[in-house]
Amino acid sequence: MSSLPAVYIVSSARTPVGSFLGSLSSLTAPQLGAHAIKAALAKVDGLKPSDVQEVFFGNVISANVGQNPARQCALGAGLEESTICTTVNKVCASGLKAIILGAQTIMTGNADVVVAGGTESMSNAPHYLPNLRTGAKYGHQSLVDGIMKDGLTDAGKQELMGLQAEECAQDHGFSREQQDEYAIRTYEKAQAAQKAGLFDEEIAPIQLPGFRGKPDVTVTQDEEPKNLNPEKLRAIKPAFIPGSGTVTAPNSSPLNDGAAAVVLVSEAKLKELNLKPVAKILGWGDAAQQPSKFTTAPALAIPKALKHAGVGQDAIDAFEINEAFSVVALANMKLLGIPEEKVNLHGGAVAIGHPIGASGARILTTLLGVLKAKKGKLGCAGICNGGGGASALVVELL
């Protein structure tokens, strides 16, 4: 890794994470993405929108969003029409993969300034009428839920990801109680971080017009953390396997809206513009295995990222492992031997939310905040994705 050109993160920003059909549901994925990009660039003194040469942005449920959501995000944020834009779909890892692609673009000398991240408005995901083009000639027609079809269903087995989370719980011996207690802890960490203002620096508030003459509303916080009710969480019925199941709605991540962006620069541009770096990208790794085992793919990607970075696992001060389900974090901690005291210290996706195309970038943005708050130096973000994959990234806080 030391032989490759350096890539620096000079800023990061994210929207609040909105609940499904909640406070941010009036905004499209490109509008959310544009807000995150604009906020990230506004943090960098000496860098103009016209300096950005390329944008990589994750988005998963792109039906009805319009052509190339990344391009819409870029132009909506005021970037030049000459900015090259690419939308990335690696399911839940899209946002982190976009950042990896941005770093690679700089390292290969194709750009000096890249914006990367991800966006998703699950509230605005449409339903499909797949047979309408050839005609509904006779009988009932069914709507297909775009969220379920393109976001939450294994394309090979045609089964919900939640059933594969159940498979993970069985494979690795995690009970319903263990998953519930983990979910409660992650909610409590998110609530504590929210109360202490630890998300304030990473969140770019969104002002929304008031309804029917009412005053404008400014959304400043993630919506989900306040919803914790431990008694209800422990009592709710399983979501995927009636009776004997261990995975429930509240010990899984919810459906959400949100976006996150980071600004990446080369060392030459950093020095030329006298920019202040936030962090340095040290390495990354991608991995894949049997699609139904997507839950534990981070346990393959994280070691690859650490090796690429030339960093030992014990040297990492904080990990972000995306909580698609509570059991995902539990299983990967177990497989890698990572203590929970180092993982998702400000809460994870179960409590904060999981706007799928954005989450990879969101966990990196939060990781930078965790390292700053805990006075840590090295951090690693890992996230699984549908189809059996995962992506991971290692950073050094500067």
Curated annotation (Swiss-Prot):
Protein name: Acetyl-CoA acetyltransferase erg10B, cytosolic
Disruption phenotype: Leads to lethality.
Residues annotated for K(+) binding in this entry: 187, 249-250, 252, 350
Gene3D superfamilies listed in its UniProt record: 3.40.47.10
CC annotations in GO: cytosol; mitochondrion
Gene expressing this chain: erg10B
Taxonomy of the source species: Eukaryota, Fungi, Dikarya, Ascomycota, Pezizomycotina
Keywords: Acyltransferase, Cytoplasm, Lipid biosynthesis, Lipid metabolism, Metal-binding, Potassium, Steroid biosynthesis, Steroid metabolism, Sterol biosynthesis, Sterol metabolism, Transferase
Misc. remarks from the entry: Even though it is not involved in catalysis directly, the Cl(-) anion stabilizes the catalytic site via both direct and water-mediated hydrogen bonds to catalytic residues and residues adjacent.
UniProt-listed GO biological process terms: ergosterol biosynthetic process
EC number: 2.3.1.9
Location in or out of the cell: Cytoplasm, Cytosol
Means of activity regulation: Activity is increased by monovalent cations such as K(+), Rb(+) or Cs(+).
Cofactor: K(+)
Active site location: 92 (acyl-thioester intermediate), 354 (proton acceptor), 384 (proton acceptor)
GO molecular function terms attached to this record: acetyl-CoA C-acetyltransferase activity; metal ion binding
Subunit structure: Homotetramer.
Pfam families the record matches: Thiolase_C (PF02803), Thiolase_N (PF00108)
InterPro entries for the chain: Thiolase, Thiolase-like, Thiolase_acyl_enz_int_AS, Thiolase_C, Thiolase_CS, Thiolase_N
